C-alpha cells in the first residue's frame, strides 16, 4: 500500500525536474503498510466566499479546520477509514465510511459525501448533521462558490447538481464515465473521465480539454489553490496546468515565492499527517 498525499489541489506534488521553476523535488507517493490518505486539508476558513484563493497565505492557520480522508487498501480495493478533522493541533474522526469532502468551503462548514448521502459539519460547533434527504453513495462532492448548491459524484460515476438544501438533485447528462469532479471560482464544472482526461461542461455539452499530454495518468483536478481568476487546476504526471472553460489549457509555472511557501506547507503537512498516521486502524 502507499500513502497518496493530494494536498491543496496537489500543490505538494513536485513538477518536472527539467523545469527551472519547478518545486523542490520530494516524493509524496511513499510506501506505507497502514493506509492511504487522500484529499487532506480542505479549507473551511471562510476566506474564499467572494474571491479567489490568495496563494498559500495562511493555509495552515492553527485554528482553521482541515480535513483528511483516510482509506486502507485491501486486496487491491480501497476501503474508507473515515474523514478526520484537524484543528488546534488535534485530530479526530468525524465521519466513518466517507472519502468525499467539499474543498474550499466559503462558510464555517464542510459538506461530506457518505454511503447514505450528504452530511454537513460545522467547524465552529464541531457538530455533524445529515444534510437533505438524499441516500446516494457519494464519492465526490464540490460546492459552488456563489451559492450553497452542490455537485455530487455517485458510486456509479454519475454527476448530479444538488439544490434546495439537499432535497433535490438533477442529473448532469453531459458528464459521462466520471472519475473526479471540480469547479472553478466561476462555478464552471470540470471532470476527469474514464480515460484520465479532463473535460469541461458547457451549454453545448462536455468538451475535451485540449493541449494536454495524451494517455495521461496520475491525474488530479480541483479549484485553483493559487490566485487565478478563471479556470481549474489540473495535475498530470507531476506537471501543473490551468484548464479553462473554453476547453484550452496551459502549463503553470511556479514563482520563487510560491516555492518558499511550498516548503512551509510541506513541514506543516508532515506534522498533521503524522498524527493521522498514528490513528488506530481496525
Where are these regions (language model features)?
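N-terminal, post-signal-peptide region of Sec/Tat-exported proteins
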Residues: 50-80
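Conserved beta-propeller blade signature
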Residues: 66-69, 109-112, 119, 149-152, ...
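Hydrophilic extracytoplasmic domains
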Residues: 226-282
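A generic tandem-repeat structural signature
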Residues: 84-169
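Repeated scaffold domains used in trafficking and secretory/extracellular systems
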Residues: 51-61, 95-107, 135-147, 175-186, ...
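Structural motif
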Residues: 75-84, 116-122, 156-163, 195-202, ...
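A short beta-strand motif characteristic of beta-propeller blades
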Residues: 43-49, 87-95, 126-133, 165-172, ...
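Sequence/structural signature of beta-propeller modules
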Residues: 1-53, 262-282
Amino acid at each position: 500500500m502507499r500513502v497518496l498525499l493530494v494536498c491543496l489541489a496537489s500543490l505538494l506534488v513536485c513538477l518536472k525536474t527539467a523545469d527551472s521553476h519547478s518545486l523542490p523535488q520530494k516524493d509524496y507517493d511513499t510506501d506505507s503498510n497502514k493506509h492511504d490518505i487522500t484529499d487532506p486539508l480542505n479549507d473551511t476558513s471562510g476566506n474564499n466566499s467572494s474571491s479567489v484563493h490568495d496563494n498559500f497565505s495562511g493555509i495552515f492557520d492553527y485554528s482553521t479546520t482541515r480535513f483528511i480522508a483516510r482509506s486502507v487498501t485491501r486486496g487491491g480495493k480501497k476501503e474508507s477509514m473515515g474523514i478526520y478533522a484537524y484543528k488546534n493541533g488535534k485530530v479526530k474522526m468525524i465521519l466513518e465510511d466517507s472519502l468525499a469532502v467539499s474543498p474550499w468551503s466559503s462558510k464555517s462548514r464542510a459538506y461530506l459525501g457518505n454511503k447514505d448521502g450528504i452530511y454537513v459539519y460545522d467547524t465552529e460547533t464541531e457538530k455533524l448533521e445529515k444534510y437533505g434527504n438524499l441516500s446516494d453513495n457519494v464519492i465526490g462532492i464540490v460546492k459552488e462558490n456563489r451559492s450553497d448548491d452542490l455537485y455530487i459524484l455517485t458510486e456509479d460515476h454519475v454527476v448530479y447538481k444538488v439544490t434546495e438544501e439537499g432535497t433535490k438533485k438533477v442529473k448532469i447528462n453531459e458528464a459521462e464515465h466520471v472519475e473526479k469532479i471540480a469547479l472553478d471560482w466561476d462555478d464552471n464544472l470540470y471532470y476527469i473521465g474514464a480515460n484520465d482526461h479532463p473535460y469541461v461542461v458547457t451549454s453545448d455539452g462536455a468538451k475535451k480539454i485540449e493541449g494536454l499530454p495524451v494517455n495521461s495518468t496520475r491525474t488530479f483536478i480541483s479549484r485553483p489553490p493559487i490566485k487565478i481568476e478563471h479556470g481549474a487546476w489540473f495535475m498530470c504526471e507531476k506537471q501543473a496546468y490551468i484548464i479553462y472553460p473554453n476547453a484550452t489549457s496551459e502549463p503553470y509555472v511556479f514563482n520563487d515565492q510560491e516555492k518558499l511557501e511550498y516548503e512551509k506547507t510541506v513541514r506543516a503537512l508532515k506534522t498533521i499527517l503524522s498524527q493521522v498516521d498514528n490513528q488506530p486502524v481496525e
